[in-house]
Amino acid sequence: MSMFCYQCQEAAGGRGCTVKGVCGKTEDIAKTQDLIIYVVKGIAIYSSQAREIGLNTSEADKFIVESLFSTITNANFDAKALNARVQEGLKVRQSLKDAIIKAGGSYNSKENKSWTSKFLSVLGIKNDKDEKEIHDAAVWAANNPEDFKKKAETVGVLATENEDIRSLRELLTYGLKGMAAYLEHANNLGYDEDSIHAFMEKALVATLDDTLSADELTALVLECGKYGVDVMALLDKANTSTYGNPEITKVNIGVRNNPGILISGHDLKDMEELLKQTEGTGVDVYTHSEMLPANYYPAFKKYKHFVGNYGNAWWKQNEEFEAFNGPILMTTNCIVTPKASYKDRMYTTGVTGFEGVKHINASKDGKKDFSEIIEHAKRCSSPKEIEKGEIIGGFAHNQVLALAPQVVDAVKTGAIKRFFVMAGCDGRMKSRNYYTDFAKALPKDTVILTAGCAKYKYNKLDLGDINGIPRVLDAGQCNDSYSLAVIALKLKEVFELEDINELPISYNIAWYEQKAVIVLLALLHLGVKNIHLGPTLPAFLSPNVAKILVENFGIGTISSVDEDIKMFMN
């Protein structure tokens, strides 16, 4: 069977990639990622049971989160690392199984008979009260990449034959991938929430359950949105407690004459470590793409060698990384297949990877040694200037709520007629120029609320302000879509409305990968309706599942700029 992947917006032909991913991943990489997901589901069978009886599941929790994150679009293209993850997963699964069996031996008193029956059932051990055959995901075994390859042929997306069940399972899985990304960042800062892990494991197990109906899976998808809100709130707490609340900031987009390191991705802990280790070395630090919002945090402003932001959204990195001249650190997705001209200057860390690119691992205490990349930078020329000037951002919920009286007054007086949430992702497709044209064409009495790399379609346009309020309010990274939800809920309270959809807020969101999926599900959980997704609807939504979202939540897509603005403003 050839590869099949349709998890991102750029799925070939709007249906799915079957020869090679548009993202650049090979058939072998795609299938190994399928197998990682299958291994994770097997681990979840045991970890959910272990959690129920009070066993420590921290090792499994960590592995599940990191593994889901490693399969997000544009995160990891390193076959060796991915195969090693499969091998490690089988060991984690076996360790959990052994712990449950050991615990069962000491919990077989009369009052624990029902529990004993239950855990024996989970293990596939027959007993007179409860017989259950354990799922293959919990028992299959292999020892080498060739055997992994054979197994991967049988466990891909298309292994689920029913189109609607497949669609719901994948929608749930992609939501979990986005959730895992946000949870990983919170964990790196020492923040965690057991209920989120418990839901992730429950949901993973549910994707293996052939007895679940479409209605039951739909309910789980919506429940995923609830935990999406929880995980974004957790990450918001982790980021702001550690680095302070983002504040209005003018960010330099020019360059200086010192050698520099360009840091891309989302991990603020990596950002902190890099700034600390480069201080006093003569090496400057620049953010790229989704790391731009690091400029808004007070804790990072004390570093004089933190220059600003270089370049634009992830998909332009081939040209921009070449022009930067210095080394690049990829902390998370999005990686584009690197050009030979800068591949030897590229470094990955965390769950990211690319074959032939140097990887920086964390030590046992979680620390990372960036000395190699710093020494590399010293041997490089300073960055080539590709633009100059400043952009403004830092409008997360704390900052916007501090401006609440000004904002509320502008709404009440009619100075601001409508807000447009244009959060989400940027991408390569030319049809995404729609979002630039849309921003330009919006009436002057409207304000754009944004988060994520979608902002690069319009954050350098001169759209002016309304009574001192910029017409583009950038909350931060894609996870900071949480801030936009908090702002909306506060406005609902201030205006004493019963329904969040009564607010003068429209949602025109550009999506690309799986973090956008969890943001969408979170918004649905909060009751937001009539969200428009573009530039196309997800390929993984079957006609029937898409119909459910349209009929129950008013989900739509985009048409032309003029038609859409007319529709939104009426």
From Swiss-Prot:
Binding site for [4Fe-4S] cluster: 5, 8, 17, 23
Reactions accelerated catalytically: A + NH4(+) + H2O = hydroxylamine + AH2 + H(+)
Subcellular location: Cytoplasm
EC numbers on record: 1.7.99.1
GO CC, alphabetical: cytoplasm
Domain of life: Bacteria
Main location: cytoplasm
Family annotation (InterPro entries): HCP/CODH, Hydroxylam_reduct, Prismane-like_a/b-sand, Prismane-like_sf, Prismane_a-bundle
Transmembrane parts of this sequence: none
Molecular function (Gene Ontology), one example: metal ion binding
Keyword Metal-binding attached: yes
Pfam families on file: Prismane
Named cofactor requirement(s): [4Fe-4S] cluster; hybrid [4Fe-2O-2S] cluster
Protein task: Catalyzes the reduction of hydroxylamine to form NH(3) and H(2)O.
Family, per entry: Belongs to the HCP family.
Name this polypeptide is given: Hydroxylamine reductase
